[in-house]
Amino acid sequence: MATKKIAQTVITEDKFYTIAAANGKVVEVKDYNTENGAQIQLWDNANAEWQQWSFVRAGEGVYRIKNRFTGKMMDLDCSGVTDGTHVHQWEGANASSQLWIVEPANDGRVKIKSNLAGKCLDLVNMNTENGAVLQIWADVNGDNQYWTINEVTRKPKTSATNFSGVFVVNAV
């Protein structure tokens, strides 16, 4: 079991984490969609499996970021490397578009950078509202490029139902 010290957070391969923006909203798979290409977005933390991620070691300091609910990896759309390339999920593959580096900051936050593009995980138009889309962008040292990785310590809410656009989460 490999671990790596990241600021004040220790990432362990067999644990799950939330990835939170500065406002506390977390990275999730939109509408708990299990399909390849499903959008990755920001949303209020509901302690749901589609908001939880594991970091699978893929080399020294390099990880694949895997969604707990879907089992799919955080991935660059069409293996893009330019500013504005959206981040989505895709089945695990030996693809450089699924490799990420976690760089600690001195304040407990981290930057998550694409190993392929060298660009930061970023919020489109610096939007921090529910539904904000994730992309990669050159490192501009903005708050929209810093993340807090928190270990999940509570049992997640796992069952979800969608009735006519109303999202219901049932505690297990």
Predicted regions and their residues:
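Extracellular glycan-recognition/adhesion modules and their associated mucin-like linkers
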Residues: A2-T34, Q52-V81, L99-T128, Y146-P156, ...
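Generic preference for hydrophobic/aromatic residues in regular secondary structure cores
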Residues: I19, Q39-I40, I65, T85-V87, ...
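Surface-exposed turn/loop modules enriched in turn-prone residues
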Residues: N36-E49, G84-A93, A138-V140
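Intrinsically disordered, low-complexity repeat/linker tracts enriched for polar/charged residues
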Residues: Q41, Q51, H88, Q98, ...
